[in-house]
A protein has these predicted regions:
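Short, charged low-complexity linear segments at domain edges
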Residues: 1-16, 75-89
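Short, flexible, mixed-charge glycine/proline-rich loop motifs
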Residues: 16-26, 97-100
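Short C-terminal domain-edge/linker segments immediately following a structured domain
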Residues: 53-54, 61-66, 118-123, 136-139
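Short Cys/His-centered divalent metal-binding micro-motifs
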Residues: 34-41, 104-126
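Active-site-proximal or metal-binding-adjacent scaffold patches in catalytic folds
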Residues: 4-5, 19, 39-46, 130-139
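Basic DNA-binding region of bZIP-type proteins
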Residues: 11-12, 19, 112-135
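The −1 position to Zn-ligating cysteines in a subset of zinc-ribbon hairpins
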Residues: 28-29, 107
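Histidine-centered nuclease catalytic patch
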Residues: 34-106
Length: 139
């Protein structure tokens, strides 16, 4: 995920080098689904949900990266939208200051969002609760 301007100060000065080292460790692929950084893929829908297809028609399990076979593009159920994969570095403990290699993982957009889903839900819930509490002060 891109670093929000308000969080930049939480990252070390050598973040670019740390990021490069994690991408190198991962072979420039998502450490979850194994999709390559910069690959152009289509995400499956319906019967093809939880899969992705590369430009060559190879279909992969979106959770493990296991190759499932090859299909014609016209036979693959998807939205028709192609996505350019951009690897980001996930902090497994959600703490940007903790840049230990074992706390960092190279993930594609889908895998990073899935990894962060529970944390994002908890943060949103806490934000709503805090806003409600502030609103109560002015009633």
């Amino acid at each position: 995920m891109p670093i929000k301007p308000e969080n930049k100060a939480r990252y070390p000065a050598d973040w670019k080098q740390i990021r490069a080292a994690i991408l190198e460790r991962a072979g420039n692929c998502c450490e979850q689904c194994k999709v390559a950084n910069g690959a152009r893929i289509a995400r499956g829908t319906g019967e093809s949900a939880d899969t992705f297809m590369d430009a060559g028609g190879y279909v992969f399990d979106a959770d493990t990266g296991t190759q499932l076979g090859r299909v014609r593009h016209s036979d693959y159920e998807c939205s028709g939208k192609w996505t350019n994969v951009v690897l980001t570095i996930a902090h497994l403990d959600h703490t940007p200051e903790n840049c230990a290699p074992e706390n960092l993982k190279a993930l594609c957009q889908r895998c990073h969002l899935r990894y962060d889903a529970q944390h994002h839900a908890e943060t949103a819930r806490a934000t709503r609760k805090a806003r409600k509490a502030v609103a109560d002060l002015f009633e």
